[in-house]
């Protein structure tokens, strides 16, 4: 199904019973978080708070609180179809040359579609129907959530930050949380390896001392939002990928104060700059780890202009101990990751990021083992293949007879096939999430790989155990008489 903008998605979700309007006045400070958290844990609907306390702008929360709604946002009615999205990305990441005329003919529609999905720039857009400038720019007029009691200030969570490096044609879309520190000031918390931070660094090198243009789009259409959190190949822009998902070009409009292009249907857009020398201490905030994080220094984003649709919707979320919305997104994107990994490592059978592992900190992989040491190759492959797995602390590899999504089977393999000294791999001084306070140094820590596969000659000197299985004929006989047993 195609959704033209966020409002269209909201309307369709409401028809499906996947969205609930809340008419009762609810405070953006703490109350919305508590309500959204209870609903998410129950597998409930998206929420539209129509009367946020002290504000006229409604708040949309828990939008991607189920795997089904993530799939719907990507244009798929069935979550199982997310594997097809992954296959498309795998092909676009490493396209294979045609094997013949027929193969070329079969692949041409996909290639043609990609070529035709460059974003379409429009002159006027809904996101610029209303404009706040000068003294009218006041972030307190927006119902920005204050999520947890220990949070230092309200926090923008679902903003799509748009940047462009000085030597790049394509823009970068990233989602970075932003702490409110004044009527027109936000702290831009982007990590050093993320696209926005890299663009900013390159701009500083190319134009020392000059302000860096930034735009933040709130309430874009679901395909564009999800495109910003999906491992899109570097050769493809997030806008192109969003166009592929919805089957129509992404309409963008140039900002009023700079040349950056933002989704034309966005509900709210923040335009402004980052001055190279202006930084501030960010946090503490409750995060997806379930803890409050440390304070760190990040650049300050000065908002010079706010544009919006008439009667805008403010899109928001919270992060906390799993499950939260990022954890659910991780489960859904898990299905996208599998074909990408299998394209590079055909021996991988399945890949699972347990939501309890804070979205990405632990991965369980099943594989068709072909030689001694094969599991270690897969571990290093997963760590290095996609940027999304740079911060994965634990990788556990099993044979293909283990269902990696069944924790009972994983524990059985772990406790029967692993010798801790032989089968545990430790890698020190690797990049670690700055929010991971367990590491001895901020941003730098160790990783562990666990080989829970059956061991081959060369890996063990002992005779390896044979799994117990019942005789097939006996099982068939018992199946035949089962109803007669009265059990």
Swiss-Prot record:
The keyword Manganese applies. It catalyses: a 4-hydroxy-3-(all-trans-polyprenyl)benzoate + H(+) = a 2-(all-trans-polyprenyl)phenol + CO2. Its cofactor is prenylated FMN; Mn(2+). Keywords: Cell membrane, Decarboxylase, Flavoprotein, FMN, Lyase, Manganese, Membrane, Metal-binding, Ubiquinone biosynthesis. It is a peripheral membrane protein. Prenylated FMN binds at residues 175-177, 189-191, 194-195. InterPro entries: UbiD, UbiD-like_C, UbiD-like_N, UbiD_bacteria, UbiD_Rift_dom. Belongs to the UbiD family. Catalyzes the decarboxylation of 3-octaprenyl-4-hydroxy benzoate to 2-octaprenylphenol, an intermediate step in ubiquinone biosynthesis. This is 3-octaprenyl-4-hydroxybenzoate carboxy-lyase. It comes from Thiobacillus denitrificans (strain ATCC 25259 / T1). The lineage of its organism: Bacteria, Pseudomonadati, Pseudomonadota, Betaproteobacteria, Nitrosomonadales.
